[in-house]
């Protein structure tokens, strides 16, 4: 039997499980103002890695958070439902959602096209990317953030 070819991904920053284990998160506010003090954008209680600057926070929240259509979760991570049983939708509220959206999409397309040697390699790829995005070791070009 032929050995499956594909990308092997060794972990450097993460261990199997939660790729965010070694990252400290905090709630912040993001506010963008005009020179005259008028508010262009404001969003409160967003979750960001604690090592990020306020400028990085403002860029992430104002430019790259999805502003609508995202299932909302309660404090335990359960999807909120309205009185009809439909998902309650709203904005992204955590940079984890953005990192997950990107890394999971890249993994999906990599697996779909046979890019990885195994599903474990695909998981390692996803986890390592999530960590690198959260620690600002890597970042895609701007259009990737919006998709």
Please name every model-derived segment.
Residues 1-147:
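Extended catalytic cores of very large enzyme megasubunits
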């Amino acid at each position: 039997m032929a050995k499956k070819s594909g990308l092997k991904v060794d972990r450097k920053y993460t261990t199997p499980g939660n790729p965010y284990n070694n990252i400290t998160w905090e709630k912040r506010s993001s506010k963008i103002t005009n020179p005259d003090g008028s508010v262009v954008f404001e969003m409160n209680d967003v979750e960001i890695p604690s090592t990020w600057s306020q400028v990085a926070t403002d860029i992430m929240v104002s430019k790259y958070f999805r502003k609508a259509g995202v299932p909302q979760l309660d404090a335990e991570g359960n999807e909120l439902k309205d009185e009809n049983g439909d998902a309650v939708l709203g904005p992204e509220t955590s940079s984890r959602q953005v990192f997950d959206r990107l890394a999971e999409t890249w993994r999906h397309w990599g697996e779909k096209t046979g890019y990885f040697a195994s599903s474990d390699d695909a998981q390692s790829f996803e986890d390592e990317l999530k960590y690198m995005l959260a620690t600002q070791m890597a970042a895609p070009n701007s259009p990737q953030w919006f998709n």
